């Protein structure tokens, strides 16, 4: 919560953007016609959420790319594009290489592009080599699996969306003020989610002997389903997959049986009724449900359906909040299984080689 508050403080003054926020950026946001986000690892989940925000909130097209694929497929470089690199360390090898390649190819074609890094390290290569940067004030993060860097970078992305929407006048002042107020409330909601720790520990005991797990979400919770699956496999070594819940009938449902835990992310939004239908499909096949549900969703615990109530939050900010319980679940499962939570096997905090 404190890291998020620090990140907000550099951008917001009350329910408005600070006048000096990104004021010194050598980027003309008004000229930007589309966004291209490049990232690796769990930053991929952040870019997917940001795509929803850029397109739904401020009507700005947004493409998202895995850096390790982007740099090798000779992508079309489009004029007046803002390329955003997301990296906790600012040294991720594939993301840095993709940035340099994009800059080189744009210069060769005399295209007007801009580059921006969202990063947690002020002295990093990406910060030095992009037109501007937005620092997340998360402080040191020792463990390989990103936690507070994940939530603060999502927060920074939302702040960037608000800034560009304000400059381009595609975001109403009233909407900006509403989201700003919700952002200030976010640390308190995150703290309340963290206080569900005991309940989540109870759920984790049911995962210890499992070998597989599914995570399901809709809308901006689909990337959080991917994040939950990534965290579980990273630190507990349980094979886990994240899916958009609407894709359940297109393959994942074949995996569901009475030994398959299925984690559901259920904020109270326009997709909730459809998500409940997906839950019924899992139950009909004998699957056991573990649901992180909005406290006002009406979803209750019952036989083979375990519910942890999550504090209500703005739909725009729900993915930031729902990342916390999936992180806690993965942490507790890993501890109970006796794995090294901070230094999981075969992985490094910063991937600086290909």
Positions of the model-derived regions?
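Residue-level detector of functional hotspots within protein domains
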Residues: 15-21, 48, 56, 69, ...
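Glycine-rich phosphate-binding loops that contact phosphosugars or nucleotide phosphates
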Residues: 30-185, 218, 265-308, 329
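Active-site-adjacent beta-strand anchor residues
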Residues: 193, 265, 319
